[in-house]
Amino acid sequence: MSTPIEFKSSNSVTKDDHLYTKFTYENSVVEKDANGKFIVTPTASDYEFKVDLKVPKVGLLLVGIGGNNGTTLLGATLANKHNISFENKEGVVKPNYYGSVTQASTVKIGVDKETGEDVYVPFNSIVPMVNPNDLVVDGWDISGLPLDQAMKRAKVLDVTLQKQLYPYLENKKPLESIYYPDFIALNQSERANNVFNQVNGEVKTDNKWADVEKIRKDIRDFKAKNELDKVIILWTANTERYADVLPNVNDTADNLIKSIKESHEEIAPSTVFAVASILEKVPYINGSPQNTFVPGVIELAEKYDSFIGGDDFKSGQTKIKSVLAQFLVDAGIKPLSIASYNHLGNNDGYNLSSPKQFRSKEISKQSVVDDIIESNELLYNKESGDKVDHCIVIKYLPAVGDSKVAMDEYYSELMLGGHNKISIHNVCEDSLLATPLIIDLVVATEFATRVQVKGPGKSDYDELYPVASLLSYWLKAPLARPGFKPINGLNKQRQQLVNLLSVLVGLPIDNELRFERILK
């Protein structure tokens, strides 16, 4: 149990299970005059926040629940909920949520009154957040294998743990899902035996609106059956090929709905799930790299004020890249090339062995350094070169299973023609890195739905903007509000989360000035 916290702030007050906070948002607006000089003007705007402190009963529906990530999440939540330990060659392993920011990391809340040293508390102790042990989990999968056997097929969790989990999962089958063969690799057809758009063994893609309505019914039934307050849907299924963004097809919300009703060939399964979620006003998170959120989906989410987040879990190689590239550029060192190679043997790798699906992943992984490069015109400009040579290779190697091997080489330019190479060899258990991200995305998304804000000149509170860029820390290619570029630097992404928590409880944002150490 963590130490209880009382926030004594003149900016916040608790009333009727809600936390009310006042905050002055300070920034600097920059203009460039006719002579090319920057004019910097400090700004300040007053905001009021309202946070619902009651943690609801939350259900999680996973698209792809029978895959490696889905079964690993089920195993993790069950092991933690029932305190299931197991023994391996290194000794007894107790259940935990290592790798989860919300469950296994801490944040600074201030300095000790006596010593002046930093004081840290668990991330999830600042404000009430849902406990992953309490999640009600179900989902869809194109494979009808019962979830205990799907866990065995995944080969992620230790066998001695699996055997203790089987009683909770045996005979539990995924909900029937959608299968549009054109969007995932043909090698996945052998798994597709649990699809509702199949008649007499033939897959039908000529009534996609009926597919939307079926998913909506599944959501409503799940919520009613389990007496849930909220439901969150997360895609952890196969990577799809990119959908073409076409005029009059998926470029606006109205055109998108019309195209679904016409069963247009560029309407992907993930988009069907997203639209169904939005129409039910249920948050939808895309954990794969495909472009589920075509412009029409984003506009639909804005119209219904329904949360969407994506794209693509940022777990291993890309997470390191978003830190290391930022470090090099901030240090005044110029990365010239980044070569990234992966091989893995799970079903994700099998699906990505198809060129169209690999292309989705390649686009997702390449974009992670874009804003970092653009932040430094001293290093990257037309004269000396404004690009980084960046290549991505992913190979399927069945023997290594879920243990993904990632090798990176960063080739950088130093002063006076010098060069530097940093080579990284990273072996990680892919699903054991990705599953904590799912937990964080769900916990953070649910919390964000309980935050309301009243901006300058507004008389009523409103929900946060539906494109949830707050989730960027956990995503390779984070969605950004239209008109804004994504932020990819990992430290910036985490600082945004921590700063928001501080603001909501009336604490000052941690500015790291540390006057008590540097002033006389």
Curated annotation (Swiss-Prot):
SUPFAM superfamilies of this UniProt entry?
Glyceraldehyde-3-phosphate dehydrogenase-like, C-terminal domain, NAD(P)-binding Rossmann-fold domains
Which pathway is this protein assigned to? Polyol metabolism; myo-inositol biosynthesis; myo-inositol from D-glucose 6-phosphate: step 1/2
Q: Which UniProt keywords apply?
A: Cytoplasm, Inositol biosynthesis, Isomerase, Lipid biosynthesis, Lipid metabolism, NAD, Phospholipid biosynthesis, Phospholipid metabolism
One of the record's GO molecular function terms: inositol-3-phosphate synthase activity
Residues annotated to bind NAD(+): 66-69, 141, 177-178, 188, 191, 236-239, 287-288, 312, 315, 346-348, 361, 401-402, 430-431
Organism superkingdom:
Eukaryota
What this protein is reported to do is described as: Key enzyme in myo-inositol biosynthesis pathway that catalyzes the conversion of glucose 6-phosphate to 1-myo-inositol 1-phosphate in a NAD-dependent manner. Rate-limiting enzyme in the synthesis of all inositol-containing compounds.
Database matches in PANTHER family: MYO-INOSITOL-1 PHOSPHATE SYNTHASE
List the protein's name. Inositol-3-phosphate synthase
Q: Which organism is it from?
A: Candida albicans (strain SC5314 / ATCC MYA-2876) (Yeast)
The gene for this chain is INO1
